[in-house]
A protein has these predicted regions:
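Conserved G/P- and acidic residue-centered "switch" motifs that form tight phosphate/ATP-binding loops
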Residues: 31
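Phosphate-binding Walker
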Residues: 35-36
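Catalytic-core regions of hydrolytic enzymes
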Residues: 114
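N-terminal phosphate-binding loop and adjacent alpha-helix
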Residues: 61-65
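ATP/NTP-dependent adenylation/nucleotidyl-transfer catalytic domains that generate, transfer
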Residues: 3-26, 40-43, 48-51, 57-58, ...
Length: 244
């Protein structure tokens, strides 16, 4: 059995156990991860139970890739532009705090992701849905995701696959090459993931799977990012009453 077929069976079982009549709600960016996840959902549930949500923040220069995917899969989709709430929220916070912080760029980058997840859950609540998480193992390992943003969801079909392995799933599923090999980026900074990370997914994926890496400085950077971002993938710590 191909790996993609195993994931498809897992998705079927998840919905059987957690909402046999529910729809799958998925944010569509047009990148490899959301494309592969959406294709897996269609294979598992049928196209009528998969609902895509395109969420540009104003004008999105590569939104054609998102339209290409939903048309290729022939799924129902909605386009919700988050630019107005994004500007209203960030401007309100800026006006009230009035501080010059080095975290400003991070906050401006993370906010759209959290608004998108709020949008997905809003739609999910209205359409009897379960929200698909589209993060992969490579992103999760170094914390390259937004807490309570794209790292959220009800179920996660590809979170145990590296970026390299997600592309292999895309090949198995017969997705268009331009979607499988689209250069990953955050959609805000106009820089690729690899430019921002300072190393390639090829190097990261090999390190994750084998522990092998040639550049010790990059190894140190990856290890540091992994430890610093574990809180994003672990359950929230809670006080244990009476030590229980």
């Amino acid at each position: 059995m191909k790996e993609s077929e195993k994931v498809i069976e897992w998705i079927k079982q998840y919905f059987k156990d957690n909402g046999k009549d529910c729809n799958a709600i998925i944010g569509i960016s047009g990148g490899c991860d959301s494309s592969v996840t959406a294709a897996l959902l269609v294979k598992a549930l049928g196209k009528d139970r998969v609902i895509g949500v395109l969420m540009p923040n104003g004008d999105q220069y590569d939104i054609d890739c998102s339209y290409q995917l939903v048309k290729f899969l022939d799924i129902k989709y909605y386009v919700i532009n988050i630019n107005k709430p994004y500007l209203e929220l960030t401007n309100e916070i800026d006006n009230k705090l009035k501080i010059d912080s080095k975290s400003y760029d991070i906050y401006r980058t993370n906010t759209p992701s959290r608004l998108r997840m709020a949008t997905l859950y809003g739609i999910s609540g209205l359409l009897n849905g379960r929200v698909a998480n589209t993060c992969n193992l490579s992103e999760d390992y170094v914390g390259y995701s937004t807490k309570f943003g794209d790292s959220a969801g009800d179920f996660s079909p590809i979170s145990n696959f590296t970026k390299t392995e997600v592309r292999e799933l895309g090949e198995e599923l017969g997705l268009p090459k331009n979607l499988i090999y689209k250069v990953p980026e955050d959609g805000m900074s106009f820089k690729s993931d690899e430019e921002k990370l300072g190393f390639t997914y090829e190097v990261l994926d090999k390190y994750i799977r084998t522990g092998e890496i040639d550049d010790l400085k990059i190894k140190e950077k990856i290890d540091k990012m992994h430890l610093a971002n574990l809180h994003k993938i672990q359950l929230m710590p809670s006080y244990k009453k009476d030590g229980k």
